[in-house]
């Protein structure tokens, strides 16, 4: 029995190799001329100048010296009957001898019957061959894929413009032998095994088939335990069912495992190969292969008794079949090395043949193709004035709309129209004076399948029948008297007819028709081609040139393909990609890029390889810190208790990050730094068993390798962090837990070796002893930095360049990068092939060109910029080419785009090195910087290559010149090697771009006083620019900005104290309008009243005061007021700035004192005096800034939302925060998953809420007392203080505090 699998294995390999050899053509000696011994009758043509057939064999010089048609037009052809099916591997052509007649380009077509021709395809399109340039030279073409056919036809496309069509031709190849079986749709072939069950671990099944219909079973086998294999043609596609030993998966209830192919009912030969080894399998239909894994529980396929071909016969019921039988021919059918058809022909006992013959019967069906949606039509005559009408035909198309039939009826019966509209069949009979009749049937008829249509009118009854089979709906009928017309127009109408003769309310039909019957008589379409019947325009007769443009599916990343007759479209919805072929990711490649685009913290999708094969992964971007952290969560970030594990019964947990390992690796490799926090709490549970024992705990990273080191240690040493620091509980061990004590200990640290991250699995084996227990937690993956986005190089000479391996791509190619330069021109990138190439260059200071040739001739796209591109600023370029279009984008300028040519080459075939910053000729080199180069999503490391290349330097300074405007509100751009950062020291804002407001909530007694003196060190390195602020304390210019929100008036917003008791006060007067008061001397005050609405209206308002010498401007929201001081006015030295209530004993102006009495109740934000931000200093640098805060100052989110975004305040909790705070050794029990955790959590929450309520009541009572104090002043001041506003803010703020997150 062991010899059987071995023999099957050998046969599998041998047969697989022979099948592939036959598929690619090519016996080395298969290049003989095939027409040497043919008679003159073997050559035929559409027409001939002699009126009869002429020999057109290569090198023929007699007679007319070759073939030339009577008229030189696109309808001419020359064909050879090779008498038998042969293998054709090459063709050759000449012009007509001794003439100026030759063909410069042509197409090849093949057929087994002389009808239903098939064009020669290459690169998934109809191939055009280059012809001759004179009448004598021979142009030879080796076919990339050999063809097996009896007839070969040459179709001239272009010819010598100074002559006519003229050809002498030859086909090369060899004889072809095959075994063929013909199935009539009611028969099958059975291959019976020598034993009851055939069990195979490997299978190879190969065949070729030609089908007359779209459905039918090609082969089937099944076993009693649920094994089955079935190959079935379903609507012109091959469906494979394959299951190994699964009794639940019956054939009747399963869906196909794989579906391949399309339009396989075209009556042409198609090849099939199924290769299986265990559960791994390859399924190939024609040239398309799909790899898949089979269903089932075992690796063997167990088939009982027999395999059936052509149908699934029902046991004990002869002539009965489970599914529709195959109707067509099968050739060279092999099952694991056994030639099934040969056994049947020799009538071997293993084969049972039922009504199967061994030659392929070919029906003489002549299809036609309507190729033009404007001008294609076919006119066929009918018998006029018959009482009734009968028309039937079959059609197939991809278009939703098109005219199928139009005919003018006799006796004033009107016009009959049959239209395909929105994929539905619509029959209209239009009457001139009366109401017409309409019948609708079918849907989705633009599915590319053959559909039959029949229109019958008899005895005042018209019937429309679609696809006359059991699944069709009942025909729709309507009573009407009609008489047949004399002409029937199919597909469209000629331009020279009136509407009554042929009416087309919709575009012409594009698709195929066949089997046209009028008055129950078939129409000979070959006679139409020869001009003896009817007329036509823009038709291909004797072939159906329908093509499935969605096979293969060129829509990338799971995009859905839809098509019409001429093109395909990609529906990218839900894929995360966009573009003509769903090639371009809609997501950024890192959190760093999101930050650069101006986004704030939050969840984002990151697509690390852009347009590459990896999909997007959801991460959290913490963009509120200097380092932009990217966090990827997994499925188990809580503390987990482990007991009862041992080497014999280990505990294991696998972590799932919501993405593939390839996605995670790309994210990690593209980051500057990554880490994961790991925590291991232990009691009598050893971790690594140091120093010499086998580890009891280990973890697995991105590969399957075990890692016996713990957080804080480095790879290669079996230690924990305390071992490296020599701080372990027991100096004899390198981990705290390895001390194996009966108390809680822990080993906590970080994994940061990127090549090992992320942690994917943890195994624990020492918690099975008495009092032995462990609790572990592995934090999320956290990374920062983008190694690519700021990866830049500088080219210093025109002869310098970087070279990289060839840019390999198939159907889509995209290139993107940033550049900056001061040069007038230069080549960015160039890659060459034998014919194909692409080149991106700045051709002038304001123009970028993208030149490319994919084999159809070079094209050049140009983008012209209205501004110079050599301004030493960063500019962005993106170029893309795909099957649909070629495009070029520069910055945000309008895109330059050109649609791809239909039916041409589309593969970009390159073989030279990729040159960056120059060309292979070392001319027109680029001077400047290039960064962030991406090729189809692949990140090119420019800096690494520049380190070993002369004339090119890694890095490129000067980012702030381009991106300094991203630093808002007075923020200063700071250059970094990898990009830039915004220094918000002198801005009242903060955040990555100085756009986050700093706001505070003021009570009636709150006072913030800023003293003007030497600057405080807000950073480690005090900047000179900061100290320069204070050199002139009586500035000639000053700018004051703030935002406020209040319901109180009068109230004091800001008080600026000068020396000699002078001041500047900004306040709201009694009516809520803005007032600015200057006192510049004892006797001189300046009061500026702004005629505004009541600003104490619980809305945010902005104030900006600018003074340049004596000129003063005050902007209140959108209103601008201008004033002037006298030139003699002198401004004193600054002493202090007060926000809220002025508490110093100062000689206040009475109006200011009145506004100051109750202080300020409300919100202040974004307060700035020149380059000083007093509110920011109070909230962020209170310990080192010259600022004093009295009473309660609460940071709040109630600041202005007018000119800046409100960034979400994000708190990042360390995964170890809830440990060690109460007990340095034992983990908090409520952090471990247990019932006690729930109880403790509830108690803690209730307790905390109680404290919150007490806090709210205390604050309320305090405010009530404060309001009681002010009752004595009610006579002097108006009762317009809105305490409800204060209370609302307090309650909201206290409630917010109660919502803080605690780990309990």
Curated annotation (Swiss-Prot):
Keywords: Cell adhesion, Disulfide bond, EGF-like domain, Glycoprotein, Membrane, Repeat, Signal, Transmembrane, Transmembrane helix. GO terms for cellular component: membrane; synapse. Its main location: membrane. Pfam families: EGF (PF00008), F5_F8_type_C (PF00754), Laminin_G_2 (PF02210). Residues 25-1236 are extracellular. Residues 546-583, 957-995 form the EGF-like domain. Expressed in brain. Residues 1-24 form the signal peptide. It is found in: Membrane. This is Contactin-associated protein like 5-1. It comes from Mus musculus. The gene is Cntnap5a.
